[in-house]
Amino acid sequence: MSIPVIFIHKGDHFYLNYSLNQIKITNPETPVYLITDSITHKHSHVTYVDINRYFTEAKEFAKIYKHMSTNGFDNELFCFQRWYILKEFCEDKKLDNVLYLDSDLLLYCNIEQTFHQYDHFDFTISKKLSPHCCYFPSISKLKKFCDFIPKLYLDPNYIDRFLTKHQYHLTNNLNGGVCDMTAFNEYQKEQDVKALDLSLITNNEIFDDNINDADGFEMKDGIKSLLFDKGYYYGTNKETGQRIKFNTLHFQGPAKKNIADYYLGSDFKKIKRKLHFECFLNNNLFLFKVARRLGYKFY
C-alpha cells in the first residue's frame, strides 16, 4: 500500500489548500487524509475525517498536561494531542507507515521513492525538534512515542527541569517553553531511539526546516533565495557554492503569505484571484456575511 499522507488541522485556512493540492500534483496516487473540525469536501482527492472521532486519548492526555509555555494554552495542548489523534486514526484504519505533514508545507518529492529509504528509523525530524514533515515507518513506532510523552508531566526529573526552563523564559521575556518539540527532542535521548534529521544535506538534497531562516543558504527579501528547475526548487549553499535540491518548503509563521508563489498547480492564478477576493470580503464584515448567506465557499 502507498504511504498515506495525513494532515491534522483545525479550521479551514487558505494555506492548507495549497498544501493539499500540492500532494495531488506531485504524488497523484497517494492517499491523502485531512483530520479536521471543518469538513468541507472541497478537494475530491482528500478523505475528510471528523477529528472528534479520534479524540479519546487526546482528552485523556489533557488531564495530565501542565502548561509551561508563553504560547497559548489551547495551541500547545493541541500540538501534543495531534499525535494521539494520529495514532488512534492509524489504528482504526489499520495503517502502518504514515507521513504526517504540517498544513503550511509544500512537498515536491516522490513519497514512495523518498521515504521508504527511512524505514529503519523510528521517525523523521528537522533540527532534532520540528516534526512538520514526520514519517513514521510503523504504527508501533508512533505508539512508542505517544507512550513516552506522559513522562514529561509525570516523571519528577522532567517536571523540575521543565519548570525551571519555563521560569527562565518568563524571567527573561523569551517566547516558548515546553511543547511537543521538547518531547521529540527528549525522546531522541532514549536508548534505541533512532531519528533521521531531514534538515541535513544528503546527496545534494534537503528538506526545508523554515523558509524564513537561511540555514546556510543565500537569502532574498527575508526568505531563502530559490530557483525553480524541472519541478523542484534549488538553493545555493553559501559555504560550498553548490546547488541543493529542496524536497519540501516550510512556510512557517509570516511566510505563509508566500506559499502561493511556490505552489506548482496550473490553477494557481484562479486560486490566487479567489484568495484576493476573500481578503477583500474579510475586510468588509457586511459583504462577508452576505457571501456566507448566499452559500459562497471560502478557501
Which residues does each PLM region occupy?
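N-terminal anchoring/stem segment of glycosyltransferases
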Residues: 1-68, 91, 266-299
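Short, solvent-exposed loop/turn segments at secondary-structure junctions
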Residues: 11-13, 39-40, 54, 105-107, ...
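Secondary-structure boundary elements
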Residues: 25-29, 88-99, 139-143, 190
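Catalytic phosphate/metal-binding cores of nucleic-acid and nucleotide-processing enzymes, i.e., regions
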Residues: 34, 118-122, 153
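An acidic/histidine-cluster motif and surrounding catalytic segment
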Residues: 60-73, 157-163
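GT-A fold catalytic core of metal-dependent nucleotide-sugar glycosyltransferases
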Residues: 78-124
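Short beta-strand-to-loop element that shapes/binds the nucleotide-sugar donor at the catalytic cleft/hinge
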Residues: 122-140
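Catalytic core and acceptor-binding pocket of nucleotide-sugar-dependent glycosyltransferases
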Residues: 146-284
